[in-house]
Structure formats: structure tokens, C-alpha cells
């Protein structure tokens, strides 16, 4: 009885959703064109990451080398997107990472992916709402923060924010109501905000390079000493000066934080299907966002010494630093519009994902309720908006930004892993008889005097199948070999990332760290070759990731390595969230 219950439970965990059960819009009507989806992705990316994270990372973590941070984070995002495009091509009727996971990998895998993407959107909404209030408060002389610190202090340092930001809560609820009124109306507002953002951003980049000074990339401790004699407000740490004032370890940590800036493509992949190929939309928005981040971070650090950058309002205060006072207000308006469009870009796809998961029974069924002829998921919008608003009310931006990076990196790593495994799996229509035949082939035949040689024959057949597959197309046996090797590779890459993240100086200084890394690389190469030797599926796809299995494994390694830069507190919060989901 117990065995049967356990077996049924296990079958539910690996149960796959039939592709024929997917509706064209997966339960909700789509009113967004391809251009609107590009606006959604660009507007979501060019938000808090551009106007808040850039200043904080440049001032405290990387200095002018923040451009390298965005290069590393952008590379990781590019590899993840390429893997997602193939993942999406396997389920042509849906563009949601959650639905694709449900169809191809099973219920448990889909829930983990979907639950972490929901966390990503919740935190992104809370962070952006806080960032909007920071920018607005800075524009009016910090009047709001000073008033809230006096009236609603929280008195829980290291856990909660200094004060409860009731204005951030109100902003999230207001936008939730706007979304509940209908997607076309909110999309129109979204285009206006994003257009203003792009215009102001272009002005900021051009002005920054005009007023920039290359000396700010070659600062010394003497420059810092002279600055402290003139300015009385809080300065950032000077480091060693130069283009990379802090160690390489800090640059990598900055790259992990900067990944926050590239999580917006989940907004596109969760929203819906359009005529334009998903690959074009996703990669075009990534290119635009990377160029914007690279240009803004370069212009900012050229205009202002990195240790003088304002933490919460870096771009408007940069114009004040160079004597362009009126331009500060123009840029501030653009910042507010950008953050507003980013908020809408987070809340819209979050409600769609919640509604879809509720329809599948993985969340409360009430959240799947839609209203009106437009089928707007009002319950999902208002419940997620309320939860995100509470997070914005209680937590500081810096406390939860890294948590969002962990959630997105894990979700994208799972997509890359899925692409690696699925490429080597047999057709889903493989008969049970063929599977049983392959299992029988793996079992050695027992015949009297040959009993003693049975283990050797079995091991020999298994080893031979690792290097010399018996079929030119994937079989059940070759698929199982790839799955096992892929899990082993993830374990080895995790150990390697941990060593490189925790003891980088010991690794490059000699033994025993260097020896350990060399052995790990040898094992990783060997297992990777085993996967490479297995037959790939000939099924036609609109896009196939090149250089398999190398590219997905590099993507997984970069994502894991960036995750290893996070603090123990971030991992504790992440664990609590996943325990709640279970």
C-alpha cells in the first residue's frame, strides 16, 4: 500500500502536460504586437537596474570596471536566451518557460521554474517601486524619507527597511488597478513611458560623454584625499584607484549583482506568442539593453569619480556634479517614467504566469479566475500586486535585489540543463516495448558456466555504449546515459564554481587548489565527451543551440559561478521562499 502511494506520488511529480491541451494563448487573450513585446522587454530592463544598480555597483563594488561587470552579465544572459529559444521551439504553442518545462520535463521541474520566476517578478516589482520612491524623494530633497523615518520606523535592522514605505505600497496597488482595467490601456501607457525613457537615456549618454574626463578612469589615492578635503558628504571606498580599483573578486560580485539588469527578457517569454520569431524579439531587446547599460555606466564613471557617485540617484546627481543643474530635472523625469514602465513590465507577465499555474492546479484555483470578454486575470493581478506591495513596504532595495538575481539565475540554469538533456532524448512516441528491449539488452544473460563472467560482461557493455553508441538516433538507453552525465556535470560544475568563488587566490597560487581544479576540469571534459558521443535527436526545430553540449554547459557554469557570489543571507531568504512553495 505504501509502495503504491509512493509510486503514484512519484508519477505525479514527473507527469508531463500534453501539448494538445495548451490553448493558443494559454488561457488568456493576447493583445500585444511584436513591437509592444520589444517595448515590454526593453522597458523592463531599462529600469531600476539602469538607474539604481549602476550607481551602487560602480561606487562600492567595481568602480569604472562596472563595464566589465555588464559584459560578463550580458554574456551569461545571452547564453541563457539562446538556450531558451530552443526550449521554446520544442513547444511551438507556448512561449512560457513554465509551460515548456511542464510539457518536456514534468510537473516538479515546471513548478520549480514557475515558482522561481514568480519570485523574480515579485522582487522586481518591490525593488522597482522602492527605486521609484528613492528617485522621487531625491528630486524633492528627501522630504518623504525624512517624514517616514519619523512616523513609521521599523526598528529591525538587518531584517527590514529603516522605515515602512507606504508610498511604494500605494504605487504598486495603483498600477495593479490599472492592469486590471485592461491590457490595451496599460500597454498604451507603457509605450509612452518607454519612449520618454529612451529619449532621456539618449540625452544622458551623449551628455555624459561630452562632459566626461578620462582621468576619472585613472584616479589615485591622492585624488581621493583632495576630494575628502572639499566634499563633506559620504564618499565610497577609494580602493587602489585606476580602472579596476578593487580586486577581481569584487568585479565578479558586481557582475552577479548586474545580472539584475538582464532578467527582463522573462517578461517577453512569459507574455505570449506573436508572429515575429521569439529569437528576434529576445535577442534584439538584449542587444539594445546591453548597449544602453554599457554606455550609461561608461558615461557615468567618466563624468563623476566613482567614489562620488550618488547611491540612489546617480544620473540626475551626475548632471548636478558637472554644473548642469536644469538637466538634472529633465533626467529625473525620465528616471521616473523608466521605473514606471519597468513596474508595468514586471506586473503584467507575473499575473499571467500565476493564472496559468493556478489553471494547472499548482497554485490556488481561485487565482485562475478571469473577468470580462478580455479575460483579465483580476485575482492574480490583485493578489500578486498586494504581495509585491507588502515587500516594497517592508524591505530595502539592496536587501532583496540579489535574491532576484539568484532566482533568475537558477531558473535560466534549469532551462539550459533541459536543452542539454532533451536534445539527446528519443522521440516521446517511443514504445514501451522498445524501452523494455533496451533494458533487457543491458542485462547480461545468465548461463551456467558463464555465471562468473556475467558482471564483467555487463560492465563491458555499459562502458562500450558510453563511447560507441549502438544506434545513430537517440534511444531510451542513450537518453538515460545523457541524463546521468548531465546531473554529474552540474555537480562537478557546482564544486568547481565554489572553489573558484571562495578561494581564487589559492587556486592560482599553486597546489593544492590548482591540482583540485585540474582534476575537476579533467573529469568535466571526460563526462562532456561521453555526452558528445551520444546520438542527437533529428527532430526538426526552428532553432537549435550550436556547439552542443559545450554552450549549455558554459551557460550553466557562468550562472552557478555568479550565484556563488551571493551572501549567506540571500541564500537563506531563497531557501525560505522555496520551502513556502513546497
Predicted regions and their residues:
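Alpha-helical transmembrane bundle of multi-pass secondary transport proteins
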Residues: 1-582
Amino acid at each position: 500500500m505504501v509502495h503504491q502511494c509512493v509510486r503514484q506520488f512519484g508519477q505525479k511529480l514527473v507527469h508531463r502536460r500534453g501539448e494538445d491541451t495548451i490553448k493558443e494563448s494559454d488561457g488568456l487573450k493576447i493583445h500585444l504586437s511584436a513591437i509592444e513585446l520589444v517595448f515590454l522587454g526593453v522597458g523592463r530592463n531599462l529600469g531600476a537596474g539602469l538607474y539604481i544598480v549602476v550607481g551602487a555597483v560602480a561606487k562600492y563594488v567595481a568602480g569604472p570596471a562596472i563595464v566589465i561587470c555588464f559584459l560578463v552579465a550580458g554574456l551569461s544572459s545571452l547564453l541563457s536566451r539562446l538556450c531558451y529559444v530552443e526550449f521554446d521551439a520544442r513547444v511551438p504553442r507556448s512561449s512560457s518557460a513554465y509551460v515548456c518545462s511542464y510539457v518536456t520535463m514534468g510537473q516538479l521541474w515546471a513548478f520549480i521554474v514557475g515558482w522561481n520566476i514568480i519570485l523574480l517578478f515579485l522582487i522586481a516589482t518591490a525593488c522597482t517601486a522602492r527605486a521609484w520612491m528613492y528617485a522621487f524623494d531625491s528630486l524633492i530633497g528627501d522630504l518623504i524619507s525624512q517624514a517616514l523615518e519619523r512616523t513609521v520606523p521599523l526598528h529591525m535592522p538587518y531584517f527590514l527597511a529603516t522605515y515602512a514605505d507606504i508610498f511604494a505600497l500605494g504605487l504598486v496597488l495603483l498600477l495593479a488597478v490599472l492592469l486590471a482595467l485592461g491590457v490595451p490601456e496599460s500597454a498604451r501607457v507603457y509605450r509612452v513611458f518607454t519612449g520618454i525613457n529612451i529619449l532621456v537615456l539618449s540625452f544622458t549618454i551623449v551628455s555624459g560623454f561630452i562632459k566626461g574626463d578620462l582621468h576619472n578612469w585613472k584616479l589615485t589615492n591622492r585624488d581621493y584625499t583632495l576630494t575628502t578635503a572639499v566634499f563633506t558628504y559620504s564618499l565610497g571606498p577609494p580602493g587602489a584607484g585606476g580602472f579596476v580599483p578593487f580586486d577581481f573578486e569584487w568585479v565578479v560580485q558586481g557582475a552577479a549583482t548586474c545580472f539584475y539588469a538582464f532578467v527582463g527578457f522573462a517578461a517577453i517569454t512569459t507574455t505570449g506568442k506573436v508572429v515575429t520569431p521569439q529569437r528576434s524579439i529576445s535577442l534584439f531587446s538584449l542587444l539594445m539593453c546591453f548597449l544602453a547599460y554599457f554606455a550609461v555606466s561608461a558615461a557615468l564613471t567618466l563624468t563623476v569619480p566613482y567614489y562620488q557617485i550618488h547611491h540612489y540617484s546617480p544620473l540626475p546627481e551626475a548632471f548636478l556634479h558637472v554644473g548642469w543643474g536644469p538637466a538634472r530635472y529633465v533626467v529625473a523625469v525620465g528616471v521616473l517614467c523608466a521605473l514606471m514602465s519597468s513596474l508595468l513590465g514586471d506586473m503584467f507577465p507575473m499575473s499571467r504566469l500565476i493564472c496559468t499555474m493556478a489553471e494547472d492546479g499548482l497554485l490556488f484555483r481561485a487565482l485562475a479566475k478571469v473577468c470580462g470578454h478580455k479575460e483579465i486575470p483580476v485575482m492574480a493581478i490583485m493578489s500578486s500586486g498586494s504581495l509585491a506591495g507588502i515587500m516594497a513596504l517592508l524591505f530595502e532595495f539592496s536587501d532583496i535585489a540579489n535574491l532576484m538575481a539568484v532566482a533568475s539565475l537558477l531558473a535560466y540554469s534549469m532551462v539550459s540543463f533541459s536543452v542539454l538533456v532533451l536534445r539527446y532524448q528519443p522521440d516521446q512516441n517511443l514504445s514501451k516495448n522498445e524501452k523494455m528491449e533496451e533494458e533487457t539488452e543491458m542485462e547480461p544473460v545468465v548461463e551456467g558456466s558463464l555465471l562468473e563472467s556475467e558482471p564483467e560482461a555487463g560492465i563491458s557493455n555499459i562502458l562500450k555504449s558510453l563511447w560507441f553508441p549502438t544506434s545513430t538516433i537517440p534511444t531510451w538507453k542513450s537518453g538515460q546515459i545523457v541524463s546521468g552525465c548531465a546531473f554529474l556535470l552540474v555537480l562537478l560544475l557546482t564544486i568547481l564554481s565554489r572553489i573558484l568563488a571562495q578561494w581564487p587566490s589559492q587556486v592560482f597560487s599553486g597546489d593544492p587548489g590548482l591540482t583540485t581544479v585540474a582534476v575537476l576540469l579533467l573529469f568535466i571534459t571526460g563526462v562532456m565527451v561521453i555526452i558528445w558521443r551520444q546520438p542527437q535527436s533529428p527532430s526538426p526545430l526552428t532553432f537549435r543551440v550550436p556547439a552542443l553540449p559545450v554552450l549549455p554547459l558554459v551557460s550553466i557554469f557562468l550562472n552557478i559561478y555568479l550565484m556563488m557570489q551571493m551572501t549567506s543571507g540571500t541564500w537563506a531568504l531563497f531557501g525560505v521562499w522555496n520551502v513556502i512553495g513546497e
